Every structure is written in structure tokens, then in C-alpha cells.
Amino acid sequence: IIIPSYNEEGNVAKCASVVSKLLSENGIDYELVFVNDGSKDRTWDIISNLARNDKHIVGVNFSRNFGKESAIFAGLETAKGDACVLLDCDLQFPPEVIIEMYNIWKNNDVDIVEGRKNSRGKENPVYKFFSLWFYKMINKSSGLDMEAASDFKLLDRAVVDSLNAMPERLTFF
């Protein structure tokens, strides 16, 4: 599970606990790769402490904020599993869906399982406006419906290896 983390000191321990418990209870072998994206708070201290005390947790630390996509790529380069799930540290996406994604991947011949929000939930109206505007512009310029796109997804190892082999790192998940 790749977990980009920026100023998430209030979420890291809960995320680790919830996701670890969920995967353990479902008999899924796992590692949690927390990538600290140059946080200004205690995020890295908490990740380091968790990693020292739990063999399932790995931490990657950036010296400054490089952005979520860079953190995702660092996690993909670090992860060793047969599949990787991208998950926000604030658990904005329900972690229980990881089990559904895993089962779809395990029982079908698919390389990517995409998560999608049913609703945007509560968010700042200004953020919501600009987000909707951004996706409208992207959709119009690309001819693709990107509004439903999400970085909550499961990637098969073959996909991870292909992404890691690409020289481009400024991508949009």
C-alpha cells in the first residue's frame, strides 16, 4: 500500500493501524510504504517510529515537498509486492474497498483496478469550484472524461514495473 503523506501527523498512526488490521484480518500479506513528502510537522518522526516497530511498515523521506506524484513514484519504486494500492493517508477513500480491489485483481485477469468516489463529501466550496473547473478544462482539452479519475487504485506488479521503467516522473495519477 503506497501512502503519500504531507503534513499528516494526525493521520499516519491511524492509517497504519486501520489498514494493517484490515489486511491482517483478511489474510493478505502486505507492506505499508509511507512516503513523507517534505512535511513541516512530525509526520516523518511518526513514520520512522512506526517503521522501527513494525516490519510491515516502510518509510521514505523527502528533504522537501516534491508533490504527490513524486511521492507515489517513490513508493512504487520501494514497494516489493505483487500489486500496489495507492491510498491517501487521510483515509478519504474507505480502506475496506482495498479488499474488494484485491479480490477483483486476484480473481480476474486485470492489471489495474480503479477506485472511484460516489460523492465528493464535505469540502471547501472554493476548492470544489476550482476542482470542478479544472476537470471541465481537462475533459474539454483532452476529449476524455477525467472527472471520475482517481489515484485510489490497485496496480499489478507488471504495471508497477512498466511505470518504474519510464523516465517520465511528472505524470498525473
Residue ranges and their predicted role:
Residues 49, 58-64, 68-78, 83, ...:
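Acceptor/aglycone-binding surface of glycosyltransferases and processive sugar-polymer synthases
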Residues 10-14, 41-50:
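Acidic helix N-cap motif at the loop->helix transition within catalytic regions
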Residues 23-28, 50-56:
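Short helix-capping segments at alpha-helix termini
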Residues 8-23:
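Short, well-formed alpha-helical segments that are part of the catalytic scaffolds
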Residues 3, 20, 28-38, 60-61:
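Short beta-strand/loop segment that forms part of the nucleotide-sugar
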Residues 36-45, 91:
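A conserved acidic beta->alpha catalytic loop
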